[in-house]
């Protein structure tokens, strides 16, 4: 199911910029595929589909998941996908309470990636667990000053919140999320 669902989503992404170009003469709409919280057990299938369709993507990995599935994290890096930190443990509450914790967590993530995946690994990409709006400016300043650029999202497939009965249902949900964006 993931392969068909992803293929439908990729086709949607390919169509969105064209539709946007018809209505917008100065700006081009762009869709970036990003995947959070991995690697997971379905990562190999996802990578295969992305490769077959020649689609770029960015993966925001969690250090504990990297430890659980180091081979999948290696596959992501070796395939040339952009990789960012989604922290070591996805500890939303801890980061909100202790601004400096985010820096320690980012360092732990990068150390884990170097130990488990590639000894030369380094990234300046970051995604806050739960999105950046949940965090105070002090945390954001620390992240920026440490050399990271953070990225949020404006559309979600809903796969983390809902169980869809079909690929079409997930695609329809995602399309509704893109309206006006």
Spans of features found by a protein language model:
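Generic "edge-of-domain/loop-turn" microfeature
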Residues: 15-16, 40, 66, 133
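Catalytic domains of cell-wall/extracellular-matrix polysaccharide-remodeling enzymes
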Residues: 90-181
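Polar/charged alpha-helical tracts
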Residues: 3, 23-25, 48, 168, ...
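Sec-dependent N-terminal signal peptides of Gram-positive bacterial secreted proteins and lipoproteins
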Residues: 2-22
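Active-site beta->alpha N-cap acidic-glycine motif
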Residues: 23-97, 101-123
């Amino acid at each position: 199911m993931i392969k068909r669902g992803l293929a439908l989503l990729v086709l949607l992404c390919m169509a969105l910029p064209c539709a946007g170009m018809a209505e917008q003469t100065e700006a081009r709409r762009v869709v970036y595929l990003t995947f959070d919280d991995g690697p997971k057990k379905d990562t190999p299938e996802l990578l295969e589909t992305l490769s077959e369709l020649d689609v770029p993507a960015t993966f925001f990995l969690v250090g504990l998941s990297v430890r659980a599935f180091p081979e999948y994290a290696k596959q992501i890096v070796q395939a040339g996908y952009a990789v960012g930190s989604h922290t070591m443990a996805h500890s939303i509450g801890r980061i909100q309470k202790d601004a400096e914790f985010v820096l320690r967590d980012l360092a732990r993530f990068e150390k884990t990636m170097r130990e488990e995946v590639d000894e030369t690994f380094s990234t300046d990409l970051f995604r806050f667990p739960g999105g950046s709006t949940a965090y105070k400016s002090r945390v954001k300043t620390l992240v920026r000053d440490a050399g990271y650029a953070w990225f949020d999202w404006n559309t979600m497939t809903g796969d983390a919140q809902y169980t869809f009965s079909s690929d079409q249902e997930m695609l329809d949900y995602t399309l509704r999320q893109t309206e006006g964006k």
